UniProtKB/Swiss-Prot annotation:
MF-aspect GO terms: glycerol-3-phosphate transmembrane transporter activity; phosphate transmembrane transporter activity
A cellular-component GO term for this protein: fungal-type vacuole membrane
Broad class of where this protein is predominantly found: membrane
Span list, region Disordered: 124-160, 293-321
Annotated organism of origin: Saccharomyces cerevisiae (strain ATCC 204508 / S288c) (Baker's yeast)
Organism lineage string: Eukaryota, Fungi, Dikarya, Ascomycota, Saccharomycotina
UniProt protein name: Low-affinity phosphate transporter PHO91
Length: 894
């Protein structure tokens, strides 16, 4: 929610330089913040020109160390205030002059209307006297004259659109004292109305002209009012940012100061503008209805539109007041339609921030594909000779277009060498064709030990095909997940549980599609909803800031505190979203660090690695946990998961913290900014969101005890979704911003697991592996498979590794001679998937960390930084899981 964006889109374009220079003041705040951190404040003395007599009250409550920075900032604020005040006075002066001129014209129109009605009454009286003598003829004459007279006396009968009406600049003047002029005006109206019924009388034209001028005045008054409010909001927000950054209390004092030391922000000024706006609406309502207004139209107060308590007993007065209110609302609505739309900025959810970060990262990436480097002259035999000469002349030439513009006919005429260059440049296509060839070979030839059962043979081919596509990311991960149901139905895999015969394509499709939407998916959406609500209403950030504010300024302790905050946030908003939130919290700290500072690297890497560890901490902390819990039977309760995961997470974070301190030695000249908690009290919405989140988490923790009411945890997840989206706290845009690629990825993994289990392939593979390890102790099995899982999860995503390995671990563990240890192996596998963090692509936190850049656009981290710290961190976590985690699981009877 950036005010600079609101200022940009809601300001009047012609006045863009006259608004508060919000961005420049932000830069000044950051400069003063850094100066305060690295300078000896005791040597700063407030100079007389920095603090005049008017500014002294603003410095009264400040400490001597802060007075220098407050005086510098106040001087910049006063300069902006003077600029805004001067511009406003110049605009107000001209606008009020136009307003008064319009006031006189409206009063003149009212006087003209009165004189016209008086003239019509006199004419009617004369016609009535003549009618007594010539009754038949006078009746016809009276009807004709009455028709014309009513048209003139009630201009609303010739109502038409303001925009389509002609603009008449002729002013009707001196009509009150000149009876001949009024007689001529009425006579002209009569004759012209009879000869041309669509002709507008001068009176009506003048009324429409006044309505146009009222629209213009209303628009300018509204823009002037918005100018005041927008700048007032800007001063409030920039002072709040200054107080937050330098730990001062300037905001309230300065806002009170500008009310009495400027014309633009004086309450009387704002009331005057609002009064003029209300009177303009009242006058427009009168002209719009064509009714007669009293001569003091512009002296009426806005309260006139409300019901008068003194006339409550008179029904006619009440009806009249009610009609005036309706007329006022209609006029206000019509006038407001001519205003520009006001853009309101809401705080983003963490999922929207992730989309923006990914979009920024994707737009910054350069196209590394080789075929894009081929010039047009290389691919096209008839390339433009001018382009070839430009490229060969040693000049810059024209950048060659990519092969996206290459036609099929041109491709067919390429020489063999250029054909080869073109084909070799399509790396993704080549990988896809190679993997697809392997898939076809597995389907066609007997290359596997599963040839005796065609269903298992097909399922193994699909498993290898999907695993290779996931591992290489030849196509997007979610696209591979969507391919799985198609392959399962086309190549028979699903076995009827009763007859053990292959299901028909119709039954197979119904079964496999029904497995895609499960309790796992609902639990995932429930976690996304909690993360969206906690981030949109700033709750997670406020709580995290309060924790970090108590960390002091010791670099080592701040690093450890940030890592535990990342762990804590990951528990409730998932480790997919936690890094984005944590990096926004430490942004002020990173801004004050020198360039290429090793502590900045340690801080960013520490948050990423701790977020990976945080993926173990709760059932909703990561997609792999949700997927693993869905396979376990019975599923562990939240309390059981916490008892297993939290001790392991604590040990892993402490070990990684020591690793970062050793590999990133502290720099003596680096000073750490003291973070300050938010001073804003919790609103009712924030308390409501917090209460709903707590209730949801408590119900999840008690899911086994209340399974007779809610069934599975996925049903409980519907509660926050209905509450937050049903009440409007979250919108449909927030729902659209969910990480749907992760949801589809989880669907694909669930579908593949069902297929592998239904075909019997999982049982056959487990029997083959069990024959090799069944005589080994369970601890040795954990060590062996733990390394395999760690390596696989390092090179593919954590979620994909879990979807491939966890079903196999479940089947192997359930058939061991020592007993059913499937739940133990599943939990170990899930924890190890989160502990793989050796590469920038190993997990969502690492991807977020590698995309972090400083203020000049340089990346904080490199691939080498991840490998040299991530691999040892993975091994330390592996050791903690297979020892401490294994021991806790054995004690708990898993």
């Amino acid at each position: 929610m950036k005010f600079s964006h609101s200022l940009q889109f809601n300001s009047v374009p012609e006045w863009s330089t006259k608004y508060l220079a919000y961005s420049q003041l932000k830069k000044l705040i950051y400069s003063l913040q850094k100066d305060k951190l690295y300078s000896n404040n005791k040597h700063h003395v407030v100079e007389p020109h920095d603090a005049n007599d008017e500014n002294l009250p603003l410095l009264a409550d400040a400490s001597p160390d802060d007075q220098f920075y407050i005086s510098k900032f106040v001087a910049a604020l006063n300069q902006e205030l003077k600029k805004i005040d001067k511009f406003y006075i110049s605009q107000e002066t001209g606008l009020i002059a136009n307003y008064n001129e319009l006031k006189d014209d409206v009063m003149e129109l009212e006087n003209t209307n009165k004189a016209t009605q008086l003239f019509n009454q006199q004419q009617q009286h004369q016609l009535q006297s003549v009618a007594r003598n010539r009754k038949s003829k006078s009746q016809q004459r009276q009807r004709r004259f009455s028709s014309v007279s009513s048209t003139d006396s009630n201009p609303s009968l010739t109502d038409m659109s303001i925009d389509s009406a002609p603009v008449i600049h002729t002013q009707v003047s001196n009509t009150t004292n000149n009876g001949n002029s009024m007689q001529n005006l009425a006579s002209a109206s009569v004759s012209l109305s009879n000869s041309n019924p669509v002709y507008l009388s001068p009176f009506t034209q003048h009324r429409l002209s006044l309505k146009k001028r009222l629209i213009s005045i209303y628009t300018q008054l509204s823009e002037l009012k918005d100018f005041i409010e927008l700048n007032q909001t800007g001063f409030s927000k920039i002072c709040k940012k200054f107080d937050k950054s330098l730990n001062t209390n300037l905001k309230q004092n300065y806002l009170n100061y500008i009310k009495f030391h400027s014309h633009v922000f004086n309450p009387a000024t704002i009331n005057r503008i609002q009064h003029h706006i209300t009177e303009t609406i009242l006058t427009y309502a009168s002209l719009n209805k064509g009714t007669r207004r009293p001569s003091n139209t512009f002296n009426l107060d806005a309260d006139r539109i409300n019901n008068d308590e003194n006339s409550s007993g008179n029904e006619e007065d009440e009806d009249g007041n009610r009609q005036e209110v309706l007329d006022f609302q209609d006029a206000e609505r019509e006038l407001s339609s001519h205003l520009r739309d006001h853009v309101v900025w809401e705080r983003n959810t963490v999922w929207k921030d992730m989309m923006n970060l990914e979009r920024k990262y994707q737009s910054a990436k350069t196209d590394n594909k080789k075929f894009s480097k081929l010039s047009s002259s290389q691919l096209r035999p008839n390339a433009n000779i001018t382009e070839s000469m430009a490229m060969s002349s040693g000049g810059a030439g024209i950048i060659a277009p990519s092969t996206d513009s290459l036609t099929f006919r041109e491709l067919m005429h390429l020489p063999p060498k250029q054909w080869l260059q073109f084909i070799m440049g399509q790396t993704s296509l080549l990988k896809f064709l190679l993997i697809t060839s392997c898939f076809i070979a597995l389907l066609t030839f007997n290359l596997t030990p599963f040839t005796q059962d065609s269903l298992q043979k097909n399922c193994f081919a699909i498993l290898i095909y999907a695993s290779l596509l996931w591992a290489t990311e030849t196509i997007p991960l979610f696209v591979t997940s969507l391919m799985i149901p198609l392959l399962i139905v086309v190549f028979p895999v699903i076995k009827d549980p009763i007859t053990s015969q292959p299901m028909s394509p119709r039954d197979s499709s119904q079964f496999i599609l029904s497995t895609m939407w499960s309790s796992v998916i609902m639990l995932l959406l429930g976690g996304f909803t909690l993360a969206a609500a906690l981030s949109k209403y700033n709750i997670a950030k406020v709580l995290s800031t309060h924790i970090l504010a108590s960390a002091g300024t010791n670099p080592h302790f701040i690093l450890l505190t940030n890592m535990f905050v990342a762990l804590f946030v990951s528990m409730w908003v998932s480790n997919v979203a936690a890094p984005v939130l944590c990096y926004s919290i430490v942004q002020p700290l990173l801004r004050t660090l020198p360039r290429n500072c090793s502590y900045a690297k340690a801080l960013i890497l520490g948050i990423a690695l701790a977020s990976n560890i945080g993926g173990m901490s709760s059932p909703i902390a990561s997609p792999q946990n949700i997927f693993s819990i869905g396979i376990m039977d019975p599923s562990p309760s939240w309390a059981e998961w916490f008892m297993i995961a939290l001790p392991v997470c604590f040990i892993c974070v402490m070990a990684i913290w020591v690793l970062l301190i050793i590999t990133f030695p502290p720099e003596p000249n680096v000073k750490i900014l003291q973070l300050h908690p938010s001073r804003d009290p919790f609103t009712l919405k924030q308390w409501f969101v917090t209460l709903v989140c707590i209730i949801t988490i408590v119900l999840w923790c008690l899911s086994n005890q209340i399974s007779g009411i809610f069934g599975e945890m996925g049903i409980i997840s519907i509660i926050p979704i209905v509450v937050f989206f049903g009440t409007g706290l979250l919108t449909s845009d927030d729902f659209n911003n969910f990480m749907w690629t992760i949801v589809v990825l989880a669907m694909g993994g669930t579908t593949l697991g069902k297929a592998v289990s239904s075909s019997g392939l999982l049982s056959t593979m487990a029997q083959l592996i069990k024959a090799q390890v069944e005589h080994e102790p369970i601890f040795i099995i954990v060590l062996i498979f733990g390394l395999v899982i760690l390596v696989m999860a390092t090179f593919v995503s954590h979620t994909v590794a879990a979807m491939i390995i966890v079903p196999l671990m479940s089947e192997i563990g359930s058939n061991l001679p020592s007993g059913d240890h499937s739940r133990l192996l599943i939990v170990i596998a899930a924890l190890l998937c989160s502990s793989a963090m050796g590469l920038p692509t190993s997990g969502f936190p690492n991807v977020t960390a590698i995309s972090m850049i400083d203020e000049v656009g340089d990346r904080y981290l490199t691939v080498g930084t991840f490998i040299t710290r991530g691999v040892p961190a993975s091994l330390l976590s592996y050791a903690a899981i297979v020892t401490v985690g294994y021991g806790i699981l054995k004690v708990m009877g898993f």
